[in-house]
Amino acid sequence: MTGVLAGRAAIITGANQGLGLAIAQAYLGAGANLFLCARDGGKLAAAVDSLCACAAPKQTILGEAADVSQPADVARVVAHATDALGTVQILVNNAGIYGPLGRIEDIEWSDWLRAIEINLMGSVLMCRAVLPQFRANRYGKIVQLSGGGATNPLPRISAYAASKAAIVRFAETLAEEARDDHIDVNSIAPGPLNTRLLDEVLAAGPERVGESFYTRAAKQKQEGGAPVERGAALAVFLASAASDGITGKVLSAIWDPWETLPSHWNDLNSDVYTLRRVVPKDRGFPWGDR
């Protein structure tokens, strides 16, 4: 088996459709062995079958229905992946939902909390579960999915935006905690994708998501959006040895020259590609300092 991920084992959450499935396909092509999970067991089984049909001899692809917001499910997935694949080197936290669409005072609070549980808490739980073996092996790759909600406000999609921003800051914090054990933790902004989440926005209509956001979503649907392959390719890079030592960053699959990052090693030891507070002097204003 050849490929930049040959011999490595990866757990990918939310891998039964959309970007998660595209990442699984890219990892398969790069030589990885895969353990996939998602809440919809039927779609997951179909995804596993499609991947197995493309697998090289001796490549392993397994799947298991699980809800990453449930600690027992997370423990089971990591235990079964480790039993089946041996040491796991890669975790991709892709599972996520938009949550309720609408003004914060109008939505169902339980739906808002559910989005936080899946998007943020699920990611944290998965990290907690794999970190002991990553630390024991003094190596690991964690890839988070941030989405546009991490870097820009998303009115009427507040649960998604809040959870994705939290994911990025959690990833940056965990990157510092795990740096000495050679565990890299990074986040991907995949760009505007034409996936299930976009269809949910269009189905909700402008009354719930706002006229401006709905208009942009409809245009994106018509024009095709960003290719999922770019996000998947970045996920391969961040799981490979080529990115060793690059950690605590949020990278745009579409706009950032991530393929060239290894040649900018010294510059990466700064706050580039991170979330930071903007102060007046950053915008050239002559006020704001005491």
Question: Predicted segment positions?
Answer:
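The beta1-alpha1 cofactor-binding region of Rossmann-like NAD(H)/NADP(H)-dependent oxidoreductases
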Residues: G41-G42, A65-V77, W109
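Conserved glycine-rich cofactor-binding loop
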Residues: A9, N16-Q17
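Conserved mid-core segment of classical short-chain dehydrogenase/reductases
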Residues: A75, Y98-L113, A136, R156-A159
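Catalytic Tyr-X3-Lys loop
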Residues: E105-V124, Y139, V143, I167
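Active-site helix of classical SDR
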Residues: C127, S163
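Active-site-adjacent segment of SDR/Rossmann-fold oxidoreductases
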Residues: A30, N152, T173-I183, A242-D244
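C-terminal helical subdomain
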Residues: S187, E207-R290
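Conserved glycine-rich Rossmann-like NAD(P)H-binding loop of the short-chain dehydrogenase/reductase
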Residues: A30-A47
